[in-house]
Amino acid sequence: AIDLGTANTLIYVKGVGVVVDEPTLLAVNKSDKSIITIGGEAKKLIGRVPDTIELVRPLRDGVISEIEMAEELVKTLLSRAIGRAYSRPRIVICVPNGVTSVEQRSIETAAHATGASEVFTIEEPMAAAIGSGLNIFEPYGNMIVDIGGGTTEIAVISMGDIVNANSVRVGGEDMTEILIEWLRREHQILVDTGIAENIKHAVGSAYQYDKEPQVTVTGRDIVRGVPKQVLLEASDVRNALEPIVNDIIEAIRISLPQTPPALVSDIDKDGAWLTGGGSLLKQMD
């Protein structure tokens, strides 16, 4: 099974577990579009490449923006995962809700090119529901809030189908970007995405919690160009993340009036199921 996400791509092999967990990123030669490296090796090049090399994210805001690059990424990662150990496997690929038929065929073609005997696609909210252990075939409303790297998808599932779906183009990567901008604006330092992600994981939160920590961050002083350290409070980081969190909450609120009353009653009893990397933000539940 393949989870093709905006930020990361995971491959799971039945009976083995997750065998690939790589950033959805490629380093490409600008002149001939040849691929230099992908995944984690490509991520190491962020901020360190010459003008002749381009870092490409084939998915943007939850949709496939670079079809050929997405196809190459899937093909390469599948070849690594499958190797010679599996002969003509059956593959299930998670795709964003609302993916176009052209995008879907392209990903299926890439999977077939690795020697797959059969290729199936499943929408990400449905896969998240199954992975959460929910009985999706019951006449019962389950709300999935899948906070990915570039998109948050909200879906209400009942009787094996998506009854109502809504999405907002914000996710974990937007949290990282807003922290970079906030540090530049409020503290006059520049940091890369790796440092911003560390801040998010260390002290980021959706709401206040007990014994909130501090974190010291080193970046480049915008004015003098020298290293500069800043001590950050968890409350300040939370305030910086607030616009993204509010966008996600608003998307959930919009989904409820579009849902049949009986299913809303079910959701009121059980709440929503949070999935995706963005759901790991402290106090997100």
Stretches found by the model and what they are:
Residues 1-147, 155-272, 279-285:
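Nucleotide/phosphate-binding catalytic cleft detector across ATP-hydrolyzing
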